[in-house]
Amino acid sequence: MIKKLLKNRKGIVGIEAAIVLIAFVVIAAALSYVVINMGFFTTQKTKEAMQSGLDESLSALQLDGVVTGKTNDQNRIEWIVFPVKLSAGRASIDLKNGTMVTSIYLPEATLLNLYQGVYNETMYGTDPIDLQKVLDNMTSIFQGKENEDMAMGIIYNDDGDTVLESTEKAFLIFHLDDNPPGGIRHTMVDYDEVKVEVKGAKGAALTIVRMAPGGMLPNSYIDLG
């Protein structure tokens, strides 16, 4: 009888040990799950931080063609036109006034934040072909300010808004004052170098450097490369 009781007792102890072991296994599995999830979460956050840093280190815009200058009757470049498009991997960028900063660095002047927004195609016609017409219209838009430094954007193949998208192309047009207060010209003469910086809401600034050639003729379009 005593032997039978001892045998039953051993059986109960074995079951209890098994239950405790199972409990340990379940707890260990739960802890492992938590640790693995934390690892995945940390990895995801690290990836997002790296992607965000990469996005900020790259410009949202890139140059997309030839930079063109337009001289006035004094043989000086008064207008500069930069063709741009979205950089690879970018979905869109808003070009409206207040979201862009454009600065221009000249031999005798540094002009900060000249940007005035997007050219109104509703008023002046969609995707105008003749650049001179665009320049004339810009002069009309800023009537009374023809002698001021300014910059505007115009979007082609657009859907009527101020957002530049992947299927669209924009031109950033700068006007330089030939006779500003103080008498220091902002226009470019032969062999002057100009640097332009364009900064959107996200990403690094797009920087473009060009030099005016020698022997520029009056009222002519100049290929700046």
Where are the regions a protein language model picked out?
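N-terminal leader/signal peptides at the extreme start of proteins
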Residues: 1-10
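N-terminal single-pass transmembrane signal-anchor helix
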Residues: 9-39
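N-terminal export/assembly leader peptides and their processing motifs that target proteins to secretory
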Residues: 41-225
